[in-house]
């Protein structure tokens, strides 16, 4: 594909990718939309690679959100590997978005990550759904799938990383975090959070 410097700049603005990556994607793609898809795929792979590295995530910040009426508050610890990233606007904006998500999501999340859920809780949840009369009416072949679907649906409400972002229902919080991981090149971990609601 033939492209101009304006095309490279536009692609950088849309994807947040580096100059060389944008130039390479435009060279390899037949259309502008295809270049965007190439960069998104590359970014997702990079985020997965960064997550799999065994670097300590002991830097970061603790941030809060208090609703203007004073009846709702959130405290969040968000970690990364270096203080350089912890001071970056992308990281601070992510922390802000996460506190707003925790405050505004209904139902409110209980766990930060799937790995935070105790095995006993999952076993209890599975037993509850298996005992459901609606599930028992289903043919034997599909019951396990129905139970797994119900568990997945409940976890998409109870686990912050699985929730749909309140500002864009096309992406999950996990994808939002992955996007910042891709931009910063560092693993980011939601360590813990607490949500306080007056009278709850």
Predicted features along the sequence, with ranges:
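N-terminal assembly/interaction segments in proteins that build large macromolecular machines
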Residues: 1-200
């Amino acid at each position: 594909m033939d492209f101009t410097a304006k095309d490279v700049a536009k692609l950088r603005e849309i994807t947040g990718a580096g100059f060389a990556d944008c130039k390479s994607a435009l060279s390899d793609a037949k259309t502008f939309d295809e270049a965007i898809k190439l960069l998104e795929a590359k970014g997702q792979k990079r985020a997965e690679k960064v997550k799999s590295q065994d670097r300590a995530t002991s830097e970061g910040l603790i941030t809060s959100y208090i609703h203007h009426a004073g009846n709702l508050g959130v405290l969040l610890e968000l970690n990364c590997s270096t203080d350089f990233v912890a001071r970056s606007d992308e990281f601070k904006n992510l922390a802000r978005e996460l506190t707003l998500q925790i405050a505004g999501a209904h139902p409110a999340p209980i766990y930060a990550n799937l790995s935070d859920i105790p095995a006993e809780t999952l076993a209890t949840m599975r037993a509850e759904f298996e005992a459901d009369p609606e599930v028992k009416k289903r043919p034997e072949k599909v019951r396990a799938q129905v139970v797994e679907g119900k568990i997945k649906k409940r976890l998409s409400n109870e686990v912050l990383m699985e929730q749909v972002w309140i500002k864009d229902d096309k992406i999950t919080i996990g994808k939002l975090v992955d996007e910042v991981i891709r931009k910063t090149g560092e693993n980011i971990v939601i360590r813990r959070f607490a949500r306080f609601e007056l009278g709850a």
